[in-house]
């Protein structure tokens, strides 16, 4: 990735692809395959199949240190018909990304891209969690943890995000504790 413009174009492309092809909770097969291919193209090691279609990718800078920070994005969509005239409207009848999970996944891909471009500045190992089934109970996160997708004892912190329509575009809000969970 050479420029901010390249990243912006890619973010738009990835998000529109994901938005066009939404999948319901625990049915995120093609979304998972899209992410896996993206990771392979960048030689990022990952494991998949967590809670069905979940993925955990890793950027390891110290193989002797089991500690890491985790970044998480959800992948599932809602059983809602999208009525949107945009060219990137859902192509799957009765299913749409109405909660922004296409954006969340895109943001995590973009973060990984930026991290790879600045890997020499990293001071900790990182894990990237693509979670299926966020909109159902029990959710994909609890299933992934039960299955051992990450070693919670070695996780120094987990970061997630959620789009917030009430905030001005281009701004970021932070909360010190659990938020929107």
Placement of each model-derived feature along the sequence:
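Acidic/histidine-rich alpha-helical segments that form the ligand environment
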Residues: 102-104, 108
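Histidine/acidic-residue-rich, glycine-tolerant segments that coordinate divalent metal ions
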Residues: 78, 85-96, 103, 120-181
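Membrane-embedded alpha-helical core segments of multi-pass
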Residues: 108-111, 137
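Short, well-ordered amphipathic alpha-helices
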Residues: 111-112, 145
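Acidic/His- and Gly-rich active-site-bordering loop/insert found
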Residues: 1-97, 106, 113-122
